[in-house]
Design a protein with these regions (language model features):
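Gly/Ser/Thr-rich phosphate-binding loop
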Residues: 1-40, 53, 60-63
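Conserved ATP/PPi-binding loop(s) of AMP-dependent carboxylate-activating enzymes
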Residues: 24, 32, 47-51, 62-92, ...
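Conserved beta-loop-beta connector loops within the AMP-binding
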Residues: 51-73, 109-110, 172-176, 211
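AMP-binding/adenylate-forming catalytic core of the ANL superfamily
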Residues: 76, 81-82, 89-92, 104-191, ...
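Acidic/polar alpha-helix N-cap and adjacent early helical turns
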Residues: 217-228
Length: 228
């Protein structure tokens, strides 16, 4: 509809300050193909840009096969040489000559990359990886949820469990049990929130990014794990 109204074409790119330019690009032609033939591609940030290599790697820095979720890593002439006066951070980010983006994602058989979540926002509960964005998407489908952020909080049995921080619609009577049950019908049971906090506002920075560190800190301050 927007393409018809504004008489324009859409593209999609993915990059970060450390990569200077994009590392993945979905061209206008690929966008049109997605609209007409393969709508799931609209969730992709595209394929590796010109002269750029992109791989999905596991926690041991090994390349993963098609469809598996891991860290998005990139290599190319546009990648930074390092952080100014931060040797240790530079070596970690550029391990093996590949930029480790900190983003979790997967690649399909055509090379299209799909971003799943930030690695640091992934919740590991009882050995299962839970991506906060998936749980948040389920919560946002509830008509009484105005805003939502999902975090992991300490749990003696599972290491950490899912907690939802919710801003509900004014005058809503929705309860913790209502939202947990709502999620259970939409995502795997082990991914559903184990608890819900109702808050007045989800903390965000100037660019609108959710400050999950602020939400996590009260729960992790007495734990050995470092909040990042």
């Amino acid at each position: 509809k927007a393409m018809d109204v504004f008489k324009c074409k859409f593209g999609q790119g993915f990059g970060m300050t450390e990569t200077v330019a994009v590392i993945c690009l979905m061209t206008p032609e690929e966008h049109i193909r997605a609209l007409n033939e393969k709508p799931e591609l609209l969730k992709s940030c595209g394929r590796p840009a010109l002269d750029t290599q992109v791989e999905i790697r596991d926690e041991n820095d090994n390349p993963l096969p098609v469809g598996e979720i891991g860290q998005i890593c990139a290599k190319g002439p546009q990648i930074m040489k390092g952080y100014w006066n931060k040797k240790e951070e530079s070596e970690k980010a550029l391990k093996g000559g590949w930029m480790h983006t900190g983003d979790a994602g997967r690649m399909d058989e055509e090379g299209f990359v799909f971003i799943q979540d930030r690695i640091k926002d992934m919740i590991v509960s009882g050995g299962e990886n839970i991506y906060s964005t998936e749980v948040e998407a389920a919560l946002f489908a509830h008509p009484d949820v105005v805003d939502a952020a999902v975090i992991g909080v300490p749990d003696e049995k599972y290491g950490e469990v899912v907690k939802a921080c919710i801003v509900k619609k004014e005058g809503s009577n929705v309860t913790e049990d209502d939202l947990i049950s709502f999620c259970k019908d939409r995502i795997a049971s082990y991914k559903k929130p184990q608890s819900v906090d109702f808050i007045d506002e989800v903390p965000r920075n100037a660019s609108g990014k959710v400050l999950k560190k602020v939400l996590r800190e009260p729960y992790w301050k007495d734990q050995e794990r470092q909040v990042s």
